Amino acid sequence: CSHDFCEHFGPIDVLVSGAAGNFPAPLTGMSANGFKAVMDIDLLGTFHVMRSTHAFLAKPGSTVINISAPQAFQPMEMQAHVCAAKAGVDMLTRVLAMEWGRDGVRVNSIVPGPIADTEGMARLAPTREIQRAVTESVPLGRQGVKEDIAAAAMFLASPEASYITGVILPVDGGWSLGGVASLGNALKSVTSS
């Protein structure tokens, strides 16, 4: 946020940070640059956005929403780089919820599950067979839609969530309860063939 922007529009009430980099690869087949690229995009990108905007957040009353991933808390084969980066994003969320809470700033994360018609699904579930397997592994029996994530963000930004901070909120149809592993297995079979 530039000083001129905030001077014109006023303090930031809601900040959503959603940088994501991803590609399937086993750790032994990944370069240090590949690993670093995902860390730079996901974790360092979130750090830079949050650090550079803190001075421009409305205090008290603003909210920060980071977009995480199931790989932050659920190990997934072929995703060591994303697991490490998004776990860092979730811990950064919790730490800043404590630090910035004193200023009246709330910080939470949303963890999207499989969301239809997104770049992430196209990259991680590139075939109909994998898409079907992922959908079948979601307890609610469907992939989410972008509006599911938007609704969660709107809730976290609303006055109804004014006493919620430091929360890592899965919006995944129950996928994080066990279905995540199926994608790792599918990725392994695709990259080995």
Language-model-detected regions and their locations in the chain:
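C-terminal substrate-recognition "lid" of short-chain dehydrogenase/reductases
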Residues: 47-50, 142-171, 176
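Short C-terminal tail/terminal secondary-structure segment
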Residues: 74, 154, 165-193
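Alpha-helical segment proximal to the catalytic Tyr-Lys
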Residues: 55, 98-102, 162
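Short, well-ordered secondary-structure patches that form non-catalytic structural/interaction elements
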Residues: 30-36, 40, 190
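Substrate-binding pocket helix/loop in short-chain dehydrogenase/reductase
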Residues: 26-27, 34-36, 130, 134
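Short, small/polar-rich loop/turn modules that mediate ligand/substrate recognition or access, typified
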Residues: 16, 101, 106, 164-166
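Active-site helix of classical SDR
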Residues: 50, 85, 93
